[in-house]
Amino acid sequence: MTEQLNTNQQNDEAQFMIQRIYIKDLSYETPNTPAVFQQQWEPELKLDLNTTTTQLDKNVYEVVLTVTATVMNQKTTAFLVEVKQAGIFTIQGAAASQLDHLLHSFCPSILFPYAREAITSQVIRGSFPQLVLAPINFDALYMQQLEEKQKATGAKDETVSH
């Protein structure tokens, strides 16, 4: 009886599976070579992140994490690398709020190490010093985004009520 109860509890939980992880797009530009190689190396990194999701089928989603790294050296662009790291995920039995969290926080957390490796590899192939991107707390970014949405919704509600 206990085993049957545990099985039923497990079936009520959300199920998550990675089907595939792949690079959807990769771009690398070095607009100021070879002059940038002659400069003292004092890099300044600008990092941009974006996540998009698409439902492919019932319970099947594509999540694309776009990471753009622009490195400036002495006010000129040394290089720009952009990777669209994608994954196809099966998610079953998740409540709407849980699904949103999985798609916009958990899945990007899975994809980021792959994107980081692709960026590092391209930078090294371009003969620049290794670019090591720090880990990103996608849970914190997700919570910040939720708070911003709630504030925006609250501000709209206040405007309407006055």
From Swiss-Prot:
Keywords: Chaperone, Cytoplasm, Protein transport, Translocation, Transport. InterPro entries: SecB (IPR003708), SecB-like_sf (IPR035958). GO terms for molecular function: unfolded protein binding. It is found in: Cytoplasm. Its main location: cytoplasm. It comes from the Bacteria. The keyword Disulfide bond does not apply. Pfam families: SecB. GO terms for cellular component: cytoplasm. One of the proteins required for the normal export of preproteins out of the cell cytoplasm. It is a molecular chaperone that binds to a subset of precursor proteins, maintaining them in a translocation-competent state. It also specifically binds to its receptor SecA. Belongs to the SecB family. Homotetramer, a dimer of dimers. One homotetramer interacts with 1 SecA dimer. This is Protein-export protein SecB. It comes from Legionella pneumophila subsp. pneumophila (strain Philadelphia 1 / ATCC 33152 / DSM 7513).
